[in-house]
Curated annotation (Swiss-Prot):
Species name: Hevea brasiliensis
Catalytic activity line of the entry: (R)-mevalonate + 2 NADP(+) + CoA = (3S)-3-hydroxy-3-methylglutaryl-CoA + 2 NADPH + 2 H(+)
InterPro entries reported in the protein's UniProt record: HMG_CoA_Rdtase (IPR002202), HMG_CoA_Rdtase_cat_sf (IPR023074), HMG_CoA_Rdtase_CS (IPR023076), HMG_CoA_Rdtase_eu_arc (IPR004554), HMG_CoA_Rdtase_N (IPR023282), HMG_CoA_Rdtase_NAD(P)-bd_sf (IPR009023), HMG_CoA_Rdtase_sub-bd_dom_sf (IPR009029)
Stretches for region Linker: 108-170
Disulfide pairings: none
Pathway, per record: Metabolic intermediate biosynthesis; (R)-mevalonate biosynthesis; (R)-mevalonate from acetyl-CoA: step 3/3
The keyword Cell cycle is annotated on this UniProt entry: no
Protein name: 3-hydroxy-3-methylglutaryl-coenzyme A reductase 3
Amino acid sequence: MDEVRRRPPKHIVRKDHDGEVLNSFSHGHHLPPLKPSDYSLPLSLYLANALVFSLFFSVAYFLLHRWREKIRKSTPLHIVTFPEIAALICLVASVIYLLGFFGIGFVHSFSRASTDSWDVEEYDDDNIIIKEDTRPTGACAAPSLDCSLSLPTKIHAPIVSTTTTSTLSDDDEQIIKSVVSGSIPSYSLESKLGNCKRAALIRRETLQRMSGRSLEGLPLDGFDYESILGQCCEMAIGYVQIPVGIAGPLLLDGKEYTVPMATTEGCLVASANRGCKAIYASGGATSVLLRDGMTRAPVVRFPTAKRAADLKFFMEDPDNFDTIAVVFNKSSRFARLQSVQCAIAGKNLYMRFSCSTGDAMGMNMVSKAVQNVIDYLQNDFPDMDVIGLTGNFCADKKAAAVNWIEGRGKSVVCEAIIKEEVVKKVLKTNVAALVELNMIKNLTGSAVAGSLGGFNAHASNMVTAVYIATGQDPAQNVESSHCITMMEAVNDGKDLHISVSMPSIELGTVGGGTQLASQSACLNLLGVKGASKDSPGSNSRLLATIVAGSVLAGELSLMSAIAAGQLVNSHMKYNRSAKDVSKITF
């Protein structure tokens, strides 16, 4: 049967001819409708109100006029005449009358609002859903019942099933009350209950009750909350769904890859797919890994700048590198110190450690190793004050020249030669137009904008989509999207040479979100799931080249769309929803 909306029965108090109170409900008994004349006031009351209003404004004007005259003549205000006393009495009386007539009704409106179920917001029509009345018409034989009530038709979108109190046990209700009162911290539910999903359910219901906001549409079931405990997310109340599309095959270094992309931007996957098609038809792309090293830069302070310089010379002395490396490398069997770069700002010294981290992205690994070195240095430099384990010279999750120049994570360059016929048939443009557009837009335009590492069309689109799909840290899209796109005509101007240089791709295939089921499946699709047993670090390096190849495909397709004047048309076709969201309610 169709679902319809019905308001809760409104309790009505009625009296019979003998004055006894009769209780009934509006669903079963209908009082005679009130006539408009029932709401009108007696004529005498209208006249009284008009008289009081006139009196109020008259005496108020009189008193203000007298007050002004006294100020002008420097007469003391406390000296009053009989007319002024009478005017004051009339003013007070009229105010009392007006407050009694209008104020009581205003106050009563609040008291009625607390008991009238039709006026309070807690009776949300969206939450009061019942099935259509299926009682036989014979139930309407009693003359006191009116069964001609027409029920409104449900016109809202289907309501997503959410957690209701019926799914909560008595123990859950007690815990919810304790969390609301503050006797049980919300963050401790997992440890107290020993069940991560139950903790998320209780925290979610508590949040809805305390905020008065519904979490409809935010899924709770179908997720392994044990897998995120202590490593991915705290205070869980559900999970967000992001669609995953595939682009490819991407022919890179002689192998084909189907690239998973998690995004909500229409046309992005389609554009990347077209770029992959053009690369495939032209014989594929090649990539080179230039560097692989994660960085961390603690900051320490000394009493004088000279002492800071002493430590700088010590750290950069090749004779001391092996000693420092032994202390650094003992933190992990994968961490291997590569270099130390120092910078001084007054009495402050910033030491940028760079090391290989295997298949992990490596931030935790390098941080632990740096802490070991700091502890070791304090033996020889007791006047060293450690300000912080990270001093932003790393630089993590920030656009910084040091990453653009020195690199961070994986530094990759990827290139391809796109044949002339492919440019015309697949990309719908020509080589000369692409070369000119790249020079004016990606190089000159970015320079005019003062861009730092942003000499590209939309590298961050591809990086972020692949990062979310494979369980990387999306915040590291900032420096991982540093990219310069180069295009030039080759083979007598017939073919197009395109390349992307990305100095700081930060990712891993173990740790963090890579172990989640969905993200692990996407890594498995690319053949880089987990750590490589044969060659530690090879899986993460391969993933970095795939990211660069995906960026190459995305740059090629978007630049072609802009050169051919297809950008607006493609986004109007694939990136606009025809759904009227204003008509969807929850």
